[in-house]
Amino acid sequence: MATVIPGPLSLGEDFYREAIEHCRSYNARLCAERSLRLPFLDSQTGVAQNNCYIWMEKTHRGPGLAPGQIYTYPARCWRKKRRLNILEDPRLRPCEYKIDCEAPLKKEGGLPEGPVLEALLCAETGEKKIELKEEETIMDCQKQQLLEFPHDLEVEDLEDDIPRRKNRAKGKAYGIGGLRKRQDTASLEDRDKPYVCDICGKRYKNRPGLSYHYTHTHLAEEEGEENAERHALPFHRKNNHKQFYKELAWVPEAQRKHTAKKAPDGTVIPNGYCDFCLGGSKKTGCPEDLISCADCGRSGHPSCLQFTVNMTAAVRTYRWQCIECKSCSLCGTSENDDQLLFCDDCDRGYHMYCLSPPMAEPPEGSWSCHLCLRHLKEKASAYITLT
């Protein structure tokens, strides 16, 4: 049986030109990435490669330093263009360059006759500005080269890859998106790091990071300054109790074991200062009556505790407990504190499984207990949220 041999595949001229253009674009992008990334990871071989620095120019030639050397080349010359070296040997001097600056140089500081380049490099004070301008020129050329390639290299990545002088400040972003990125930096940081330290203002991406910061930074400083008595870390009382009971996770165990001072009759002696602002009244700037915990004696201003008007009046009618001593008002235990639900009108705590009927998940918005619903009626936070 005869076998049919297919003829060679004929490609159109347009297809061939497009393939050549794609090949040229890929090679140009590959060379640009190899010169910018240190090292460059070759996707075809999986080998990390570095720039070889073997390509030199005539202007990079310097005088020989060792016996028998005619030329020497500087290291990594592609990062910064060197000025023309003045060769002392007349046989090696280019005929097109006639520089008459040797005599003034010798008169000024008694520079050596041999390698003039080393003497010029010693005068760093007069050449720093020129070198900075040369570096900026190289950076501009490389960035302009990248704009011609159809790829998505970020301008910020380019700035990180191009080396800078050790004591030089970070340059401004170049390109069309540079201004927009600087303007959106604050909003991106607020969105990526929503957890803020209320003492120093440092931001974190998650709550465990903020908890670690509180425990190992501010708590350690406080324990080093005041070994006799320990103050509680500040916490924010929020109307959203679902977020509020999650804050119990970052309270240190050492702070839970705070021993209260008791009077001879057995009653707890409350602190005479606010544990959060230490008496400064930073929230309002006005004097306020302190609210003290019935179990540990810690005190705080209503504004520092972020209490509402109804909550401030309600906590004085019963034995109020701070966040570290809080227990369920129905069963009287502080176990399973992650299940505690706090009333937004009186700050009493209730286990969700102790309520009638029990709750599987905390409700959205404000929540009022049965006592506040009976006493405040339409003025309760739960009714205000619904309306």
From Swiss-Prot:
Zinc finger (C2H2-type) in chain: 195-218
Binding residues annotated for Zn(2+) 1, in chain numbering: 274, 277, 301, 304
Record-level Gene Ontology MF annotations: sequence-specific double-stranded DNA binding; zinc ion binding
Family annotation (InterPro entries): DPF1-3_N, Znf_C2H2_sf, Znf_C2H2_type, Znf_FYVE_PHD, Znf_PHD, Znf_PHD-finger, Znf_RING/FYVE/PHD
Binding-site residues for Zn(2+) 3, renumbered to this chain: 328, 331, 351, 354
One GO CC term, this protein: chromatin
Subcellular location: Cytoplasm; Nucleus
UniProt keyword list: Cytoplasm, Isopeptide bond, Metal-binding, Neurogenesis, Nucleus, Repeat, Transcription, Transcription regulation, Ubl conjugation, Zinc, Zinc-finger
PROSITE patterns (UniProt xref): ZF_PHD_1, ZF_PHD_2, ZINC_FINGER_C2H2_1, ZINC_FINGER_C2H2_2
Glycyl lysine isopeptide (Lys-Gly) (interchain with G-Cter in SUMO2) crosslink location in chain: 106, 129, 133
Function: May have an important role in developing neurons by participating in regulation of cell survival, possibly as a neurospecific transcription factor. Belongs to the neuron-specific chromatin remodeling complex (nBAF complex). During neural development a switch from a stem/progenitor to a postmitotic chromatin remodeling mechanism occurs as neurons exit the cell cycle and become committed to their adult state. The transition from proliferating neural stem/progenitor cells to postmitotic neurons requires a switch in subunit composition of the npBAF and nBAF complexes.
Record text on subunit structure and interactions: Component of neuron-specific chromatin remodeling complex (nBAF complex) composed of at least, ARID1A/BAF250A or ARID1B/BAF250B, SMARCD1/BAF60A, SMARCD3/BAF60C, SMARCA2/BRM/BAF190B, SMARCA4/BRG1/BAF190A, SMARCB1/BAF47, SMARCC1/BAF155, SMARCE1/BAF57, SMARCC2/BAF170, DPF1/BAF45B, DPF3/BAF45C, ACTL6B/BAF53B and actin.
Name this polypeptide is given: Zinc finger protein neuro-d4
The gene coding this protein: DPF1
